[in-house]
């Protein structure tokens, strides 16, 4: 039911209205142009609304109407391959209506209400259905079967169910109590979709990035943060995860970042093949674009919109990865709204509820047994952009308290052109112990001990570097000089990865394991040769050592690696004979 009031005060994106009989988080139409807004505070007869569009020119006395509904998204066939703004308006529809720049007060349906979809029922007349049950399927893309579910708050007995081509708003099923079900359902973005129970993550998210999979794995259904200063590679890392992670669905939220970065995704994804299915990556992707030049308040909506879309596909039993780039921009939007509301500021001006909002977002991730008995997951990966790369600032610190994987990007590494610029000494993963059994069974029995050994070597290298900077590497014992060479190989061959190289951009587990195994084999053989009296200068002259870095770029990886390993054995045999 619509209730009409009038605007009392305007302060940027925050509008105060009087005479509105509204409740918290009601959706409102503000001003003569009907700008979209949401009730965020009610004080006596004054209703405070955050507006998701530019409020220039809005003045006191203009009408303000509450719709009686919360901000909700449309869920159904047609979501995949779409690009939305923060409040689920399809950008291609807005382009047709208003041109290159989004006009004010423009509304657009999240799904195409005219497109026909082939619906195949999986229940029959007389079947009892409850919230979350699948009543039929639609083949949305070649690989994704879109399951049409009963809304979580509806249950009953099927009186009639249809089969054939329908739009998302056509009635496809009627229950005995008269409830009509469509392929589309609306769901409030701030309300988490219910599940039967949460489960413990047991499998890793395979990203194809060696430093992430090898040293700091994230579980499917886990949470991770990528903090880093400007230019250290947050967006490229996020895009790599979107491209190559082994989930069925990817939701990419560009929250307050540059528009060009979203344009990159739109150019690249249709051209790239999903390594699991061989289909274009765009077919499994939903983009929520809320770029830096779009209204500040809509950044908050974009994060919740993206998470609700991810939960919907999780409820079908799919594994979803959600990328939020960047949560810092969302926090800055909260800070701006909070200051407009004249709330007491917390640390660095951020609102006192910053940590609660971040926790609310990340807690919606996880592995779950859905209402229809399927097992689905959401892996949430948030980029954090601390000013000046200062990890002690509130957004980074509050995120660290919540997430279980921390991939710390380092400006010094990026300046040395070491990419991904993830600092292996500052980063960590709390899923390592949970995933060790999976790695032992599915990769190799010696994978976990080899990984730990590599980490110990890198740790020792950082301690030796202090001495090297003072007196040079020649002052070290030969054994330690050799250790520095092995760790250099680990860094340059294993940890460095070229995101723009057609072969090196994606590295499957088997390839990762064989590269690390080859480095360790060279290291062990070199140490043995040193102990048998061979000079380190002789060992470092070996050709196979210089050829090993090229192997990861070769299309015939197996053949190239075997050739280098054979040469390595030959050279060490020749050294031993001296």
Swiss-Prot record:
InterPro entries for the chain: ATP-synt_VA_C, ATP-synth_a_Xtn, ATP_synth_asu-like_sf, ATP_synth_asu_arc, ATPase_a/bsu_AS, ATPase_F1/V1/A1_a/bsu_N, ATPase_F1/V1/A1_a/bsu_N_sf, ATPase_F1/V1/A1_a/bsu_nucl-bd
Gene this chain is encoded by: atpA
EC category: translocase
Protein name, as recorded: A-type ATP synthase subunit A
GO cellular component: plasma membrane; proton-transporting two-sector ATPase complex, catalytic domain
Principal location listed in the UniProt entry: membrane
Gene Ontology molecular-function annotations: ATP binding; proton-transporting ATP synthase activity, rotational mechanism; proton-transporting ATPase activity, rotational mechanism
Xref: PROSITE patterns: ATPASE_ALPHA_BETA
Membrane-protein topology: Peripheral membrane protein
Quaternary structure (record): Has multiple subunits with at least A(3), B(3), C, D, E, F, G, I and proteolipid K(x).
This enzyme's EC code(s): 7.1.2.2
Similarity remark: Belongs to the ATPase alpha/beta chains family.
Keyword Amino-acid biosynthesis (UniProt): no
Location of the protein in the cell: Cell membrane
């Amino acid at each position: 039911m619509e209730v009409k009031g009038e605007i009392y005060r305007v302060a940027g994106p925050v509008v105060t209205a009087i005479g509105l009989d509204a409740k918290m988080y009601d959706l409102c139409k503000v001003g003569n142009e009907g700008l979209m807004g949401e009730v965020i505070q009610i004080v006596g007869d004054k209703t405070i609304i955050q507006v998701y569009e530019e409020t220039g020119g809005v003045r006191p006395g203009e009408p303000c109407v509450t719709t009686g509904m919360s901000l909700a998204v449309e869920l159904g066939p047609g979501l995949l391959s779409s690009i939305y703004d923060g409040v689920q308006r399809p950008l291609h529809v807005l382009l047709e209506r208003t041109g290159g720049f989004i006009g004010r007060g423009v509304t657009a349906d999240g799904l195409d209400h005219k497109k026909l979809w082939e619906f195949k029922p999986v229940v029959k007349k007389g079947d009892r259905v409850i919230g979350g049950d699948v009543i039929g399927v639609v083949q949305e893309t070649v690989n994704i079967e879109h399951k049409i579910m009963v809304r979580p708050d509806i249950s009953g007995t099927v009186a009639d169910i249809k089969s054939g081509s329908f739009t998302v708003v056509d009635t496809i099923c009627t229950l005995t109590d008269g409830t009509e079900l469509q392929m589309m359902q609306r769901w409030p973005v701030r309300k988490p979709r219910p599940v039967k129970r949460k489960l413990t993550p047991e499998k890793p998210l395979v990203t194809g990035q060696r430093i992430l999979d090898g040293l700091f794995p994230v579980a499917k259904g886990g949470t991770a943060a990528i903090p880093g200063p400007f230019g250290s590679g947050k967006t490229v890392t996020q895009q790599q995860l979107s491209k190559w992670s082994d989930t069925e669905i990817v939701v990419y939220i560009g929250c307050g970042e540059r528009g060009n970065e979203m344009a990159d995704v739109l150019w690249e994804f249709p051209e790239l093949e999903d390594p699991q299915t061989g289909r274009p990556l765009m077919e499994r992707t939903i983009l929520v674009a809320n770029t830096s030049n779009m209204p500040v308040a809509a950044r908050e909506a974009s994060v919740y919109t993206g998470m609700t879309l991810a939960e919907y596909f999780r409820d079908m039993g799919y594994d979803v990865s959600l990328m939020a780039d960047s949560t810092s921009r969302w926090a800055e939007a909260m800070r701006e709204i909070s200051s407009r509301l004249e709330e007491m500021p917390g640390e660095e001006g951020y609102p006192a509820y910053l940590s609660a909002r971040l926790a609310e977002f990340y807690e919606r991730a996880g592995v779950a047994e859905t209402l229809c008995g399927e097992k689905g997951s959401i892996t949430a990966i948030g980029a954090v952009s601390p000013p000046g790369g200062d990890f002690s600032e509130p957004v980074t610190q509050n995120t660290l308290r919540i997430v279980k994987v921390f991939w710390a990007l380092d400006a010094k590494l990026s300046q040395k052109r070491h990419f991904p610029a993830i600092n292996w000494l500052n980063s960590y993963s709390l899923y390592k112990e949970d995933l060790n059994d999976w790695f032992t069974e599915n990769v190799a029995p010696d994978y976990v001990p080899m990984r730990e050994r590599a980490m110990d070597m890198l740790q020792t290298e950082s301690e030796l570097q202090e001495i090297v900077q003072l007196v040079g590497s020649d002052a070290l014992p030969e054994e330690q000089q050799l250790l520095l060479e092995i760790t250099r190989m680990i860094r340059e061959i294993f940890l460095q990865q070229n995101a723009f190289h057609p072969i090196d951009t994606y590295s499957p587990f088997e390839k990762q394991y064989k590269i690390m195994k080859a480095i360790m084999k060279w290291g062990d053989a070199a140490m043995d040769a040193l102990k048998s009296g061979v000079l380190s200068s002789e060992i470092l002259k070996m050709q196979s050592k210089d050829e090993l870095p090229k192997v990861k770029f070769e299309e015939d990886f197996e053949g190239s690696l075997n050739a280098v390993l054979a040469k390595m054995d030959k050279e060490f045999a020749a050294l031993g004979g001296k």
